[in-house]
Design a protein with these regions (language model features):
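Alpha-helical segment proximal to the catalytic Tyr-Lys
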Residues: 126, 170-174, 237
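Residue(s) in the substrate-gating loop at a strand-loop-helix junction
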Residues: 141
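Short C-terminal tail/terminal secondary-structure segment
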Residues: 146, 229, 240-256
């Protein structure tokens, strides 16, 4: 097992990529800490893990709330004594052209997607420093590398996460802490499915996205989960401050 007895904290693990990653990590022997704002969905992830003889606990917390985050990290340390892997997966989308976005909406996307990563990492890192080990996986996006219409706020956050990843890797490498970023393309999560269903022509919207993929299909949450597993495991011990693309060739095709 690639993560046997590793304590892995995954934010936003109630659905989509976070849930799929939690299930996979548990199969690989990890003690999974499932975090989500939605208690029902988070508990369902834990139920499925335990049903398959894995180990997991659920902690409800809002990643934008410092008190919530500190209490969550303290609870993990009290229960397991350490945190080996942090997957900063929680995030929200932002849709709209810049001139149409109001400040409240802009700040909400910044708060969840940037401040959430900052806060959870801030409270986890001191424990990894004491351990002299750890792997931090931040969720960026291939949108940080290419332009995409109507995604100004979301793209801003994902570019920031990539910069943050590279910067803090320099700070914490001496503590044997690795910090890397996942950069998925369009992944067919429940959120994306719901978003596409609201398009005037859902089928054409799906086909349009598929045409941008060199592989001709949409990604699935498990595709990203396997990449996260690699970054969480010792197999990736020489990857530090690295953007890891799982984009179906979108960036390569765009640049080509």
């Amino acid at each position: 097992m690639r993560l046997k007895n590793k304590v892995c904290l995954i934010t936003g693990a109630g659905s989509g990529i976070g849930k799929e990653t939690a299930l996979l990590f548990a199969k690989e022997g990890a003690h999974v800490v499932v975090n989500d704002f939605n208690e029902e969905s988070g508990q369902e992830t834990v139920r499925q893990i335990c049903e398959n003889n894995g180990e997991a606990i659920f902690i409800q917390a809002d990643v934008t709330n410092p008190e919530n985050v500190k209490a969550m990290v303290d609870q993990v340390i009290d229960y397991y004594g350490r945190i080996d892997v942090l997957f900063n997966n929680a995030g929200i989308s932002g849709v709209g052209q810049l001139h149409d976005i109001d400040l409240e909406t802009w700040n909400r996307v910044m708060n969840v997607n940037i401040n959430g990563v900052f806060l959870v990492t801030k409270y986890v890192v001191p424990h990894m420093m004491k351990q002299q080990s750890g792997s931090i996986i931040n969720m960026s996006s291939c949108i940080a590398e290419i332009g995409l219409a109507n995604r100004a706020s979301y793209a801003t956050t994902k570019g920031a996460i990539l910069a943050l990843t590279k910067s803090i890797q320099v700070d914490y490498a001496k503590y044997n802490i690795r910090v890397n970023a996942l950069m998925p393309g369009t992944i067919f999560t429940p959120f994306v499915e719901d978003y596409l269903s609201k398009d005037p022509n859902p089928e054409e919207a799906v086909q349009s996205i598929k045409r941008r993929q060199l592989g001709g299909d949409l990604g699935k949450p498990i595709d990203v989960a396997f990449a996260a597993l690699y970054l969480a495991s010792e197999e990736s011990k020489f990857m530090m401050g690295t953007p890891f693309m799982i984009d179906g060739g979108v960036v390569n095709g765009k640049l080509g």
